[in-house]
A protein has these predicted regions:
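Extracellular loop and loop/strand-boundary signature of outer-membrane beta-barrel proteins
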Residues: 35, 66-72, 114-121, 159-167, ...
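Residues on the lipid-exposed face of transmembrane beta-strands in outer-membrane beta-barrel proteins
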Residues: 50, 82-88, 131-137, 148-150, ...
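Surface-exposed strand-loop-strand hairpins of Gram-negative outer-membrane beta-barrel proteins
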Residues: 25-26, 55-79, 112-123
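Outer membrane beta-barrel transmembrane domains
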Residues: 28, 67, 204-298
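Transmembrane beta-barrel strands of outer-membrane/channel proteins
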Residues: 31, 48-54, 99-107, 146-152, ...
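Short loop/turn motifs that connect adjacent beta-strands in outer-membrane beta-barrel proteins
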Residues: 24-25, 38-45, 89-98, 138-144, ...
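Residues that define the transmembrane beta-barrel architecture of outer-membrane proteins
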Residues: 44, 74-82, 120-129, 170-174, ...
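Detector for outer-membrane/organellar transmembrane beta-barrel domains
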Residues: 145-152, 158-243
């Protein structure tokens, strides 16, 4: 999934904050997509998981984490991400082999008052294609998962350096994933999870700028009620680890919030709703993330 929201927010601020022209996050992956038990992949089967990702922001921060212009900033992004997931019965190194992929649809709108005048605009498009292979283990009170995936630059992308409102990023990204869920009690009513992702970026095809690598941590603590409902807290931390080839400043963000999920066994259907408040952001937008996830097993 794309971190489109931040790029659009910064685009709205260009006239007021020229020093942040190249401060957009370098991650393809948008934090907050996963939450409680995010490191646990399902048992063998074919699934369609529909992510509905909302991001709002009304401020832009400098590298010190302090709020800067523009005035009356209002930015909104909605991403619909239908993910196809197949966990096979085949095992490798004791883990179930799986494959998944998605192609996101992205809508963005933003408005702001800048020294150059009032800015307002919106855009809609298809983002970059992602495909991944996974391994997953379910051992007593632990779930483990690893994955290796690639983002292909199939969507419309920027043609010049700096922020852009296009749904694609214009470069290949190779993402490595590893995570674990620990069920604290034998009944598995308490769970603690951590999901780590690292993205290696390549040169942007038009700007010839190579974005820095990015690290993302998504975590969750949850309690199961009546066997079919989970409630808990979830959060994320994302940081640009290495600098862009154009020497622009690094960025990072952290968030926390509540989550509730419910399972409908007879219908083989699962739904989760999560909110994350970004309490810290450096060299990027600071806002709110909402995620509604619908999962159906076939």
């Amino acid at each position: 999934m794309k971190n489109q929201s931040v790029r659009f927010v910064i685009a709205a601020a260009l006239a007021a904050v020229p020093s942040l022209l190249l401060a957009q996050p370098s991650a393809h992956y948008a934090p907050g997509v996963e939450g409680i038990k995010g490191a646990s992949l399902p048992p063998p089967g074919f699934y369609i998981r529909d992510y509905n990702y909302f991001y709002t922001a009304d401020q832009l921060n400098n590298p010190a984490g302090n709020k800067i212009g523009p005035a009356d900033l209002d930015a909104f992004t909605y991403v619909n991400l239908p993910r196809v997931l197949w966990i096979t019965d085949t095992k490798f190194l004791g883990g179930f082999v799986g494959v998944d992929g998605f192609l996101p649809l992205v809508y963005q709108q933003a408005s702001a008052n800048t020294p150059a005048g009032h800015f307002s605009g919106n855009t809609f498009g298809v983002g970059d294609l992602f495909a991944e292979g996974t391994l997953s283990w379910h051992i007593k009170q632990f779930d483990f998962s690893v994955g290796s995936g690639v983002d292909a630059p199939t969507g419309d992308s920027p043609t010049s350096p700096g922020p852009a409102t296009t749904p694609g990023l214009g470069y290949w990204t190779f993402m490595q994933t590893a995570g674990a869920t620990w069920y604290v009690d034998e009944a598995k009513t308490w769970a603690v999870s951590a999901l780590n992702r690292y993205e290696f970026n390549t040169e942007q095809r038009d700007t010839h700028v190579t974005p820095g690598d990015a690290y993302t941590l998504e975590w969750g603590v949850s309690k199961t009620l009546a066997k079919v409902v989970d409630v808990g807290a979830a959060g994320y931390y994302q940081q640009q680890v290495t600098g862009n080839s154009n020497k622009s400043p690094l960025n990072r963000v952290a968030a926390v919030g509540p989550e509730v999920s419910a399972m409908f066994p007879k219908q083989m259907f699962f739904v989760s709703l999560r909110y994350n408040y970004e309490f810290m952001a450096e060299n990027r937008a600071q806002g709110h993330t909402f995620a509604l996830t619908l999962t159906k097993r076939f």
